[in-house]
């Protein structure tokens, strides 16, 4: 309650709660962090100005925000931009965010340069990302261009990553015709962030499929597609849609035509 003589509020009661301290000024109550309470050396009967109250609350707010930030960083690494976004979402003020980021950087808990290097190494080793994808992801995480320019991507390491990705996709795309397999492989490796030279290197190493197996797949796909389109089309329209659909799936035009010729011969 404010003193009539000084205009200051007098602390009438102090109550400790789990993780916080409640300080009473008559009917008025404020809640402070343990650190804020200790920092301002509060006790019953002490007179406090309104400006001092504001400082206590700001200190306490920053204390809570700092603990929140440490909790986040204890679970995983963040870039400075990502951490700022988390603090904003948690309601931290601009001043609190600025001070917290400064403190975390001073204590080595927040280091964009170290983050970028670690991310680049792990993304290439574990996720099989190429240089372009890694730089793209780091830019989205707010890493400064000067830091990105310092990163080094050993060619041998990137080639090894591309090989692991290539082998994974070979298994995934095994049921497709070779041409479709090449299209999918090119797109997949491009999305992983590998450059054109590496992509072409692996495209050339896609093995030819078993001819008998490839033909069997085409014939089955031909019958399936024909059955679907024949419900709506016939004659030339059916033929055109059959060819377009099968070529889109990666089957060669001349092999499709050969099956059509066989079918026409059998029907004559």
Regions found by a protein language model. Name each.
Residues 1-268:
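An alpha-helical, amphipathic repeat domain used for nucleic-acid recognition
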